[in-house]
Amino acid sequence: MPRLPNSEDPPERPDFITNIINGLERYNPEAVGTLEQYLTTQCEERFCDCNANRTLLKLYQLNPDRIKDEVITNILVKAMTLFPSPQFSQALHLLSPSALSQQSELSEAVSKLRALNNQLEGAQYARFWATIESDDLYADLTTDIQGFEEMVRLRIAVLVSQAFREVQLSLMEQWLGLDEAPLKTFITEACGFKIEGDIVQIPKNPDNEAKKAEIREDVNVEMFSRVIRRAWEEVA
């Protein structure tokens, strides 16, 4: 089962991006193009650098003439794949309220992405896949993000593995938005789970392992004597 990646300081981040994030270059309008190209790299190579993307959104705040709607939606989609986390909300709060309040393509796109993110955050996975299929605009919004659906499915699988040892195959079908052969291939090959009949067997891990809870309460002699004394007083 793959581990959840480090999205704040990913190992893929090059030194020149670190210099922009941590230095005075983060206020330089000329850094916009560099950060936009870095976002393209993230989309193509399936990793996310939320720190760098927030830096880009802050530069957009300072330089509204440089704003690109497609870049904003790509940042939001990348943040969405990190559910459950505050990354989507943090990116959303860096957007210009005036841009979102207008009846524009960006406003509509952000509204749709917010709805998708809410479904993922609320573990409404079946509803998420149904929503994705309901409007071609969702495909347009996620087309730049290589492996978007696979990343979401892997994230769901990780969360399921943290909570369960056994899951009905029919439930996994709904949660992963797959059926029959593709579903079984993903479960066994991408996730490393086993299928026995209509049950998905999930390997034991520190999160889903049943642990015996031990509750101890220390009672000293003085506390015990007070209880006995109070009982005698009530009788008397």
From Swiss-Prot:
Q: Does the keyword RNA-binding apply?
A: no
Gene Ontology terms, MF aspect: ribosome binding; RNA binding; translation initiation factor activity
Q: Does the keyword Mitochondrion apply?
A: no
One CC-aspect GO term: eukaryotic 43S preinitiation complex
InterPro entries on file: ARM-type_fold (IPR016024), CSN8_PSD8_EIF3K (IPR033464), eIF3k (IPR009374), PCI_dom (IPR000717), Transl_init_fac_sub12_N_euk (IPR016020), WH-like_DNA-bd_sf (IPR036388), WH_DNA-bd_sf (IPR036390)
| Limits of the PCI domain | 48-218
Protein name (Swiss-Prot/TrEMBL): Eukaryotic translation initiation factor 3 subunit K
